[in-house]
Regions:
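Carbohydrate-binding surfaces of carbohydrate-active enzymes
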Residues: 57-67, 72-487
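Mature N-terminal, pre-catalytic/accessory segment of carbohydrate-active enzymes
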Residues: 1-71
Length: 487
């Protein structure tokens, strides 16, 4: 509260470091925001917005009102800056960041780290390898609390009243694995939803621009992520969570500018469909007087959009195709390990690097989180006869992006995969240290495969969806089984 405090203590001989930890309800950014790691705080949102809606319109729930859409929630402990690689600076281990906190989070940290937990907290504000375990433990707890306190609490409330909970978090700028405006772990952040969700806006997709930095009015995008990882994050969560029934919604078309006509919209739709997105929110309609400067293009624009008479054809095409790609099973033979856990602990290759190589070679895949090998209540995993099966999704190969650290359960699963005949690859680096236990990492003599050779190795194992006569880096293909047909 601003009252000066005098601290008296007897310093030992030599150099002494004094660390003072303070909790506060204000960080200077979104101070009105609920606390995503506190169940009571998140319940305030339900009481203030959801309950009054049900009180007034409950008779229409499940009929006229099919659900609630949550748009871009996150920890919001800070805004964060954009780094040179177009990612957010809100990564755990940065020395000047205020961290999400609650009594329950502190209790679980104490439980996991035992009596020395306060002495280990300094690792949360450094990227020193010695702090890998406390960083991972903190983020593991924080993202589990985000899931339980916010997303699942809202989802459970909705389902009890016969409606769905859908929406998406901020995925860009690596927010999906970090704090700040991010939610720390994509799969946990959408775990309470009845559909997975993503959005693509402001020219985050552009034909033939699939790598490097692409400028926009607030900075630059990492185009490799949007082209090769974003949609697959959503469709992977849709497949791995039985509650979602293979459904993933994408906000599309919004804020691209007036240059985006129906031809580009069709290209964006195809980009999403072939990657498993089968529900859409066409985000480009405005009822404001023309011209409305907010997030054009606008489909109708009070008759000023000359392509409006043909817009229905695009919607009809998207509706028919999305229907054909619903209720069935996409054949994706490769699992790529989601890198969030490894990044919290230390150096880690982002998933889009591996995804780009596989996509250009027509090798389909899902992203699979490390918690699949840890959480038996949420994931049913079997490893046998050359297959890794996660909640009925079957994979013939497992690819781990380069990382310095690995979890004990993931390492054990990889050993079992290799013994069962599943193809196992570690890209560029084999981790040598655990982030959640002591001891040496033993992966059965696994050696690193250079990133440039990964697609070739998988293709040699017959894992391409289609096999072109010559390399076709821009060809995309999906094989889908539905109602006794494969197409």
């Amino acid at each position: 509260d601003g009252t000066p405090v005098r601290l008296r203590f007897d310093a030992p001989a030599g150099i002494t470091t004094l660390e003072l930890y303070v909790t506060s309800q204000k960080t200077g950014f979104r101070d009105e925001y609920i606390n995503m790691v506190d169940a009571d705080s998140c319940r305030m949102l339900i009481n203030a917005a959801y309950e009054p809606t049900f009180e007034h319109l409950g008779d229409e729930f499940g009929k006229t009102i099919l659900g609630f859409f949550t748009d871009e929630p996150g920890f919001m402990n800070e805004k964060g800056a954009t780094l040179e690689d177009a990612s957010t600076s809100s990564f755990i281990g940065r020395g000047d960041m205020a961290l999400p906190w609650s009594d329950e989070l502190a209790r679980r940290l104490h439980e996991e780290l035992s009596a020395s937990w306060l002495a280990e907290l300094r690792g949360l504000w450094t990227r020193d390898p010695a702090g890998a375990r406390v960083r991972h433990t903190y983020m593991d707890i924080a993202t589990q609390l985000y899931r339980a306190c916010f997303d699942e609490q809202i989802g459970d409330w909705c389902r009890k009243r016969g409606v769905m909970h859908i929406g998406h978090v901020i995925e860009d700028k690596s927010c999906h694995t970090r704090l700040g405006q991010g939610a720390g772990h994509y799969f946990r952040a959408v775990a309470g939803q009845d559909m997975a969700g993503i959005d693509v806006v402001i020219n985050q997709l552009a034909p033939s621009v699939d790598h490097g930095r692409y400028s926009y009015f607030h900075g630059a995008w990492n185009m490799e992520f949007f082209t090769y990882a974003l949609a697959k994050l959503g469709s992977s969560a849709a497949r791995l969570d039985p509650k979602k029934q293979g459904r993933c919604m994408a906000e599309v078309f919004g804020a691209f500018g007036w240059h985006e006509g129906l031809r580009e919209m069709k290209w964006i739709a195809d980009h999403m469909l072939v990657r498993g997105i089968n529900w859409f929110t066409p985000h480009a309609f405005s009822m404001a007087p023309f011209p409305d400067w907010d997030c054009p293009p606008h489909f109708y624009a009070h008759g000023n959009n000359p392509q409006w008479p043909h817009f229905g054809q695009l919607m009809s095409y998207m509706n028919r195709t999305a229907t054909l790609l619903s209720g069935g099973y996409a054949m994706r033979p490769v699992a790529i390990l989601y890198h969030a856990d490894a990044e919290w602990a230390g150096n880690a290759m982002p998933i889009e690097r591996v995804a780009a190589e596989l996509t250009r070679a027509q090798i389909d895949f899902d992203f699979v989180p490390a918690e699949a090998f840890e959480d038996e209540d949420r994931y049913e995993v079997s490893i046998a006869d050359g297959l890794l099966t996660v909640n009925d999704c079957r994979y013939q190969a497992f690819v781990m992006p380069g990382a310095s650290f690995i979890g004990a359960a993931t390492a054990e699963a990889m050993r079992r995969m290799a013994d069962a005949g599943v193809m196992v690859l570690a890209v560029d680096e084999v981790p040598g240290t655990f982030y959640d236990t002591d001891g040496a990492v033993e992966l059965g003599g696994l050696v690193a495969t250079p990133l440039a050779d990964v697609a070739r190795a998988l293709a040699s194992a017959g894992l391409q969806t289609v096999v072109p006569d010559t390399p076709q880096p821009w060809l995309r293909a999906l094989r889908y089984k539905r109602v006794g047909e494969t197409y």
